[in-house]
Amino acid sequence: MEELVGLREGSSGKPVTLQELWGPCPRIRRGIRGGLEWLKERLFRAREDWYFLVALGVLMALISYAMNFAIGRVVRAHKWLYREVGDGHLLRYLSWTVYPVALLSFSSGFSQSITPFSGGSGLPELKTMLSGVVLENYLDIKNFGAKVVGLSCTLATGSTIFLGKVGPFVHLSVMISAYLGRVRAKAVGDTESKAKEVEMLSAAAAVGVATVFAAPFSGVLFSIEVMSSHFSVWNYWRGFFAATCGAFMFRLLAVFNSEQETITSIYKTRFRVDVPFDLPEIFFFVALGFICGILSCVYLFCQRNFLRFIKTNRYTSKLLATSKPSYAALVALVLASVTYPPGVGRFMASRLSMAEHLHSLFDNNSWALMTRNASPPWPSEPDPQNLWFEWYHPRFTIFGTLAFFLIMKFWMLILATTIPMPAGYFMPIFIIGAAIGRLLGEALSVAFPEGIVAGGEVYPIMPGGYALAGAAAFSGAVTHTISTALLAFELTGQIVHALPVLMAVLAANVISQNLQPSFYDGTIMAKKLPYLPWIRGRQIGSYPVTVEHFMNSNLTTLAKDMPLEEVVKVVTSTDVSQYPLVETRESQTLVGIVERTHLVQALQTQPASWAPGQERFLQDILAGGCPTQPVTLQLSPETSLYQAHRLFELLTLQALFVTSRGRAVGSVSWVELKKAISTLINPPAPK
C-alpha cells in the first residue's frame, strides 16, 4: 500500500508523509533529521579521513589493551598453579607443560577450523596484497575473531613457547580498516577505489605496530619498510595520525587502570646520560652489528629450510594435513619440557616472562662483575627488583647461561614458527638480539673492568647499551629494516645510544641484505605466494635485458572487423581475463582493452533487431554498449627489465601489453617478469 502524502500549510509545496504531518513534535524531529544528515555529509566526505583514522587507532588500542589484560590474568593463573602444586616433580612438571599444550592445541584447532588464513604472522600475505595481488577472503571480518582468540591463547603460554603479537596485530588492524572502509562505502553509497583502500591499509599497518609497543614513529617507519617497496609521502600523515591516536590511547588505558602514573615508555632504562659510551666503543658496536648480521643469516637460512623440511617430510606433512592441533600439542610439549625450571630451564631464565627478559637484559649494571666476588642465591620466585638473579648459576656463570639461552632459543624459535597458529615472531627475535648484545657487553666489562681509559677519563662499560644495540641490530637484520633502531629508543625512552645503535643496525643489514632474503620474503617464498623478486641496484645487468627478451609473444587479440563467430571461438578457447582490442586484423593497432566478462555478457544478449543470417562483427557489439577500457600504459620492446620492474612495483600492476609503433606485439605479466629476474639473478649453467 502506498504511503499517503500531503502538503503542510505555508510550506513551499514539497510533499511530506502524513505521519510526519500528524506525528508529535514535527519540528524537533525535522531538526534532528537535518542534523544527522549534515553530520553524515560532513563525516563521509570523500577527502575527510580523520574520523576514520581516529576510530581505527582507538579501536585497536582497546583491543590490544584488552588482550594484554586477559592474557596477563591467564599467565598469572599458570604461575599460581605451578607454585601451589607443591614440591612433587611430577605434579610440577604436569602443571608446567599441560597448560601451554592445551592452550596451543586449542589456538591451532580453533583458528584453523574457522579459516586457514588466521595462522602465522600475516605480514607476508599483507605485503603481497599491497603489491597488487588479490587474496580472496583474507580480510573478511570472520577471520578477525579467529585471529583474536587464537593469538590470545598463543600469548597466554608465556615465554614457554616464546612468541609475540606484532605480525598478527598488524593483520587485525588491517582487517578492521577494511571493514570500516566497507561501512563507509555503504553509508556513502559508493564503491571505494583501489588506491584509497591501499592508502588506508598502509595506515592500518602502522597502527598495528604502534598499539603493540606504544611507538608511533617506529610503527609507521617499520610498516613502510616491511610492507611497501614504494610509499607515497602524501600518505605519511595518515599513518602518523592513526598511529599516534592508537599509541596514546594504549598508554592512556594503562594510566586509567593504575598500572602507570603517567604516560611513559614500556621498558624504562637507567643508562648514564652524561657520557653513555666512549669513542673507542664505537668499534665494538659496529662489530656487534656484523655479528648480528652473520647470525641473522644463519637463522634465516635454518628457518626457511626447516620449514621446507617440515612441509615435505612424509610424517610431519601428513600430521599437519590431518591433525594440526596434534602437531601443535606435540611441539608445545617439547618446548615446555625444555623450559621446565627445575630442569634445563634453570640455565635459560625460563621463569621470566618476555617483558621481564627485556627488563633484565637492559640492566646497565655488569652481572659478571657483580658476581665476581659474590654468589647470589637462586630465589624461590623471581625477584622483580633483581631479575638478573635468574640469569646466574654458580657453575654455569653469566656467560654460560646467556650462551645457553641463545643456543636453545635459536632452534626452539625455529621449531615454534612451524606451528599453524596465529603468532608473531618479531618480539622473540628482538629478545634474542638483546641477549647477543648482553653477552658481548658482559665480555667487554670483564675485559675492561675499570672501563675504557681515553684521555685520562674512565668510562665504565654498560652491558645494557650493548643489549639495546643487539636487539635493534638482530631484529633489523632478520626483517631487513632500519627502523628497529628507532623502535629501541621509543621502547626504552632513552636516545643516548642513538649513533652506536644506528651504526650497529646498518652494519647488520649490510650482511643480511646481501646474503639472505628477509624473514617475511622468505616466508612468501616458502608459502609460494605471488611476489616479484627484488632487483638489488643496477649493477647486475638489468638494463641490457629488454622486454622483447622475455615478453609473451603469443598474444590473442580481438579486431573490430572480426566476425562474431571467430570472436566466440576465441572466447571459448582461451581463459584470459581481458583481451587487447585492435583496429583491424591487418594493422593490429592497439586501441583498447575488452574485459572477458563484459564481452561474454554482450554476446549472450544480442539485440533482437538483428536480422537472422546477417553477418555481424565485433564492432557491432561494441557499438551496442559493450564497455571498453583505454590503454593508459604500455611497454615498448626496448624497455629495460629494470624499468618494467619499477613500473610494476610502483603502480601495483598485474600485466601490461607491449606495442611497437602502435602494433600489439606481446604482453608482460608477473609470470614473465619474475622468470626474467630469476634467470638474471641465477643464470642457468652453460651447456
Curated annotation (Swiss-Prot):
| InterPro entries to which the protein is assigned, alphabetical | CBS_dom, CBS_dom_sf, Cl-channel_core, Cl_channel-K, Cl_channel_volt-gated, ClC
- Protein origin, superkingdom: Eukaryota
Any GO MF annotation of the entry: chloride channel activity
Show the GO cellular component annotation of the record: basolateral plasma membrane; chloride channel complex
Which residues are Ca(2+)-binding? 259, 261, 278, 281
- Which residue intervals are topologically Cytoplasmic? 507-687
Tell me the Gene Ontology biological-process terms attached to this UniProt entry: regulation of body fluid levels; renal inner medulla development; transepithelial chloride transport
Q: Per the annotation, which location comes first and is thus the protein's main one?
A: membrane
Q: How does it assemble?
A: Homodimer. Interacts with BSND.
Q: What is this protein called?
A: Chloride channel protein ClC-Ka
Q: What's the source species for this entry?
A: Mus musculus (Mouse)
